[in-house]
């Protein structure tokens, strides 16, 4: 049958229209979550403080709902402000959301793509996670309790000797929030850092004053919380800028310089540890154990970064170095920050503090120090710790996740490549979940008759708080952190009457306002800025026990082959 030219033209038009309709229907996408209107190209970049976004995110959640979206340049950010939304995406749909956002400067440049916390969900991340879980998991972390006990006893002695030094000397923070080495914050930091350094490298932090090693660790951690904050660098919001030449990309030189700074410290620690291992003089720790196992597999020398491609997936030297960093960071910052917030909140709520002391006196008394076996018998103290973590989460927005595929949630599109944030601050300030959310009310978690349930428990929907994240990226150091928080804070309540500074003219107590965001530092991790506190032993008997315990621990260090304390 012959077909005319007109018929061919009509057929072509019909086919074209059909194809267009089919294509349009097949690719019609759900709408994005609502959010504030931005400006062309830059989006919402200049509408809030990118170094302290959580107060504005809470306001936007109240206006636009539990799931809203913003843009920082070309970077789409989806913010989840209810536990239901975060649980659904990060736990139930974890296959799509187990990657973390990898900031260009913080991950690619400063960390040379080796820092676990910012790795995508990949084979390399699984290798690192397996090794980290092997020493920080629920079983292995309990093996650290002796070290936690001993280091905590040193901490108590340091606070006893410190007395009212922080009040009398009225210290001021140094550049970039640097803590003076004689401030009481440094005593707490020594505890957490020494614990983690012993776990990883088999060496203690046995001195506070004139010890640049201790303070550089926290300078580097503080630096990382700033450079990895979404929106901190324009290149993270506009990835096309990565193609600029060096002369037009100052962040590139800055990132490389910071990497050299980190490797000058962490890289030297690893190199010294490896040399000691090769010489047969190595100390017991994660790095030594891993190098030994790797050598037994015939891979004594394995420079470079990443892991081997074989089934064993042995970590190369730089990946071991940054895995050690990840372990130290996981166990140091959260714990010390929680202690600073706990002391501030308890001093701001004297009735809660009085009740904690009364409970401690009734359960433990003055003839011994509290231990982990007392935890279930100290429900008010545990409730105070949980309420501290709710009111002052160390990571108000957690670690940002990334959508590995397009997804639809509650009718809203979450495009592939979007940064997806679990808004811990908004969840913790939800008046439905926590009535009167800005008030410090430990009774929310007070359960004198039941088994205490920490955030590391299996029930993701009824957790007390969300500071350890969600799903497959749940914080590896959670078990060690919870154990440290309990032993440090229980013994602090047991051993001391701690008190704030007073105004010499009015006699009124001077304390930072816990509900003022300016009380806390900026960045991915937020901690109280330094404030003065004095420490007085609750009795002469408590003081003598602390002194005797300090002397006994020096013998323990000697028998364990670890450095004794220098004060």
From Swiss-Prot:
Its cofactor is heme. Pathway: Secondary metabolite biosynthesis. Glycans are attached at residues 223, 279. It is found in: Membrane. This is Cytochrome P450 monooxygenase 79. Keywords: Glycoprotein, Heme, Iron, Membrane, Metal-binding, Monooxygenase, Oxidoreductase, Transmembrane, Transmembrane helix. Its EC number is 1.-.-.-. The lineage of its organism: Eukaryota, Fungi, Dikarya, Basidiomycota, Agaricomycotina. GO terms for cellular component: membrane. Cytochrome P450 monooxygenase that is able to use dehydroabietic acid as a substrate for oxidation. Heme binds at residue 475. Belongs to the cytochrome P450 family. It comes from Postia placenta (strain ATCC 44394 / Madison 698-R) (Brown rot fungus). Its main location: membrane. It is a single-pass membrane protein. It holds the Pfam family p450. InterPro entries: Cyt_P450, Cyt_P450_E_grp-I, Cyt_P450_sf, Cytochrome_P450_fung. One of its GO terms (molecular function) is oxidoreductase activity, acting on paired donors, with incorporation or reduction of molecular oxygen.
